[in-house]
Amino acid sequence: MANFTAADVKRLRELTGAGMLACKNALAETDGDFDKAVEALRIKGAKDVGKRAERATAEGLVAAKDGALIELNCETDFVAKNAEFQTLADQVVAAAAAAKPADVDALKGASIGDKTVEQAIAELSAKIGEKLELRRVAIFDGTVEAYLHRRSADLPPAVGVLVEYRGDDAAAAHAVALQIAALRARYLSRDDVPEDIVASERRIAEETARAEGKPEQALPKIVEGRLNGFFKDAVLLEQASVSDNKKTVKALLDVAGVMVTRFVRFEVGQA
């Protein structure tokens, strides 16, 4: 004879978010001991999280607050639209803004109420049955403009940008954030492009031009032209502005009296 009631099952479901059958089994296994049933479900949830470790987390959202930007991943867009998942992301980014962690591991140890970020993520993962992953975090401590972009009106933001800058023209900084979101700049200036990347681009440009049958004496000029094309695509300050393609981003920032010191761009599921 069962040592628990339907009300016990309902209460356990409300507390843990586990399914009805799982709650009934947990109560049966523990002879109706509610606290032990809760523990059993948490243990099972933790084990399930481990089993989910190999699943892909290509969905999710980005969130920003007070100079902090995070990416929190899940497996499906159904969960990305889930209110509890979005609330968790808001709590995580608030914890990041408060704690200013150096990296994801440090953020996982930050507090959300009486739990750590890592515990809060694991508990929601166990509850909804999907792998959840805190993928990355960025913290800027200067004057910051944040921009979040939605790919679809029914989905949470999937692209997030932080721009740290000096100057008083917030509108110009916002325009730069939009630029970064749209055109995916990778570097702020030429000086920020790693030497091995430049060498690789130069080598590719030279080999391509040679394969096209270009005259050997013309190769240096052709290579420099193509390398400049790479910089105009990858370097923020050298990109043509989306608001005025006859001017570079640097030219417009100079007029506005704004200097971008650094930026970061997160896109869900992308490097």
From Swiss-Prot:
It is found in: Cytoplasm. It comes from Mycobacterium bovis (strain ATCC BAA-935 / AF2122/97). Associates with the EF-Tu.GDP complex and induces the exchange of GDP to GTP. It remains bound to the aminoacyl-tRNA.EF-Tu.GTP complex up to the GTP hydrolysis stage on the ribosome. The keyword S-adenosyl-L-methionine does not apply. Gene3D superfamilies: 1.10.286.20, DNA helicase RuvA subunit, C-terminal domain, Elongation factor Ts, dimerisation domain. Belongs to the EF-Ts family. The gene is tsf. GO terms for molecular function: translation elongation factor activity. PROSITE patterns: EF_TS_1, EF_TS_2. GO terms for cellular component: cytoplasm. Its main location: cytoplasm. This is Elongation factor Ts. Keywords: Cytoplasm, Elongation factor, Protein biosynthesis. Residues 76-79 are annotated as: Involved in Mg(2+) ion dislocation from EF-Tu. SUPFAM superfamilies: Elongation factor Ts (EF-Ts), dimerisation domain, UBA-like. InterPro entries: EF-Ts_dimer_sf, Transl_elong_EFTs/EF1B, Transl_elong_EFTs/EF1B_dimer, Transl_elong_Ts_CS, UBA-like_sf. Pfam families: EF_TS.
